[in-house]
């Protein structure tokens, strides 16, 4: 099961964007793209076949390895580990993600 999903709030714990808090835009295998984190400048060559591509230097987010980010717990305002557990309700057990520091449930899977 993936511990980090698209839309989660994470904090960068290593690299040039260390300390940056942002939302996960997308997950790519073992990498995540964090909103406003790990910004790079990309040089784009003009393409006459595509009128929207004028060329130049653009700034965009590059992927970060999942080991360089951690879940951000808004209650403790710190990086936190995520665990999985099963909760039983009405005879049906559901798998949930929770913060290990304060056992607060993040979401149901």
Curated annotation (Swiss-Prot):
Check the record and name the SUPFAM superfamilies matching this protein. Answer: Translation proteins SH3-like domain
Could you list the residue ranges forming a coiled coil in this record?
A: none
Note the CDD domains from the entry: KOW_RPL26
One GO MF term attached to the UniProt entry: rRNA binding
What are the UniProt keywords, alphabetically? Ribonucleoprotein, Ribosomal protein, RNA-binding, rRNA-binding
Q: Which processes are annotated in GO (biological process)?
A: translation
Looking up InterPro entries in the UniProt record yields: KOW (IPR005824), Rib_uL2_dom2 (IPR014722), Ribosomal_uL24 (IPR003256), Ribosomal_uL24_CS (IPR005825), Ribosomal_uL24_KOW (IPR041988), Translation_prot_SH3-like_sf (IPR008991)
Q: Which domain of life is it from?
A: Bacteria
**Gene Ontology cellular component list:** ribonucleoprotein complex; ribosome
The subunit structure is: Part of the 50S ribosomal subunit.
Function as written in the Swiss-Prot or TrEMBL entry: One of two assembly initiator proteins, it binds directly to the 5'-end of the 23S rRNA, where it nucleates assembly of the 50S subunit.
PANTHER family, A to Z: MITOCHONDRIAL RIBOSOMAL PROTEIN L24
**Record's family?**
Belongs to the universal ribosomal protein uL24 family.
Write the protein's name: Large ribosomal subunit protein uL24
């Amino acid at each position: 099961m993936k511990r980090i999903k698209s839309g989660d709030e994470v904090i960068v714990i290593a690299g040039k964007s260390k300390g940056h808090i942002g939302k996960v835009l997308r997950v790519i295998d073992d990498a995540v793209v964090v909103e406003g984190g790990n910004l790079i400048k990309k040089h784009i060559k003009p393409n006459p076949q595509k009128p929207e591509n004028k060329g130049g230097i653009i700034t965009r987010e590059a992927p970060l390895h999942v080991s360089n980010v951690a879940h951000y717990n808004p209650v403790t305002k710190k990086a936190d580990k995520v665990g999985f557990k099963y909760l039983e309700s009405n005879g049906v057990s559901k798998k949930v993600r929770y913060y290990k520091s304060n056992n607060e449930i993040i979401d149901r899977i």
